[in-house]
């Protein structure tokens, strides 16, 4: 395929691409250890609008059969459904016991160890944006000039700045 001409244009993403973008570009920024250290774009934004109205972002460890699902995190806290953004407002970070104590809230069941040698830190389980009311075909039809992204690869994220770059592996003009 021929390389398209660059420039500003609308982007519509398929489910897989939008999931990767949400996980990498936003999800890690909800992890409380980054916020506690002031390293996230969402540090000090609790209770403020961080997304357009109507956007709900959830981390849910209770989805049966999902790769990120679990009964208990690595600290023995039950896995749960945590609403991080509700109607565009930041309502919760993802917590382990340490960050929960720091913020004066209950742990969210996101304490995760890299191995038995490491201490738990707050990490996502199954983070997603809830579906809206728009029909995917109507969204695509509403774009006069743009790109539909089916798949990303090789990305880079700076969670403290809200800056990210991804290579479009599969997309259509």
What are these regions (language model features)?
Residues 1-173:
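N-terminal small-residue-enriched
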């Amino acid at each position: 395929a021929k390389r398209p001409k660059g420039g500003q244009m609308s982007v519509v993403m398929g489910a897989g691409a939008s999931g990767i973008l949400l996980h990498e570009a936003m999800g890690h920024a909800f992890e409380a250890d980054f916020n506690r250290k002031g390293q996230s774009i969402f540090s000090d934004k609790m209770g403020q609008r961080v997304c357009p109205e109507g956007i709900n972002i959830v981390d849910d460890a209770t989805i049966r059969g999902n790769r990120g699902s679990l009964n208990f995190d690595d600290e023995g806290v039950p896995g749960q459904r945590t609403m991080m953004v509700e109607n565009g407002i930041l309502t919760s970070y993802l917590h382990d016991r340490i960050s929960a104590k720091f913020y004066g809230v209950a742990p969210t069941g996101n304490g995760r160890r890299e191995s038995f040698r490491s201490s738990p830190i707050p990490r996502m389980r199954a983070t997603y944006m809830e579906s809206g009311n728009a029909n995917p075909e109507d969204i695509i039809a509403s774009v006069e000039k743009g790109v539909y992204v089916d798949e990303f690869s090789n990305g880079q994220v700076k969670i403290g700045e809200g800056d990210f770059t991804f290579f479009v592996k599969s997309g259509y003009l």
